[in-house]
Amino acid sequence: MQNNKVQSSDADVTFQSSDNVDFRLHKRYLEFATGGFPPANTPSSLGEIVRLSESSTTLDILFQFVYPQRHPSLDKLGFEELLKVAEAAEKYEVFGALTATHLMLRCVSKFLHSHSKQVLQFACVHRVAPLVERLAPIMMDTPLSKIKSALILCPSYFVEWVSTLDH
């Protein structure tokens, strides 16, 4: 179900999801709430549609973080949905969504335990140190051979990880 704010009739930019759902947004809000979209005064063709690779479900949640309103609750999202929103937040630098998804990944115990390798991969790819720190004690018994592909993405995390395991 799409939020009315991301379907504004007076919007000046249209994004289309991978499943062909259009999202009409205001450039001025994108400019202030993100780092991954051009400034509001950037010229664009009338009626231009910007195609994005994410699904409408992911974009609907993500774009709600762009507007000056109460942000959506992520509590009911499953791990895969949350990770998709987190990846999109990183890609488009949607600041509110970055904070919310990082917090959910760091604080929801069931995700940390049941999807620890995926969370570690995300944390290393996007350089989210608090997530790596949170995972270290949880994954203490995981052989380094099983997680080195994630840790190698950021050597400084690898050093910290090994130091944590020594204590």
Region roles according to the model:
Residues 1-74:
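BTB/POZ (also called T1 in voltage-gated K+ channels) oligomerization domain detector
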Residues 43-46, 77-80, 109-117:
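Alpha-helical oligomerization/assembly modules used to build nucleoprotein complexes
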Residues 82, 97-98, 131-132:
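Solenoid-repeat scaffolds in large eukaryotic assemblies
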Residues 90-93, 127:
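Ankyrin-repeat interhelical turn detector
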Residues 101-167:
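Acidic, serine/threonine- and proline-rich low-complexity regulatory tracts
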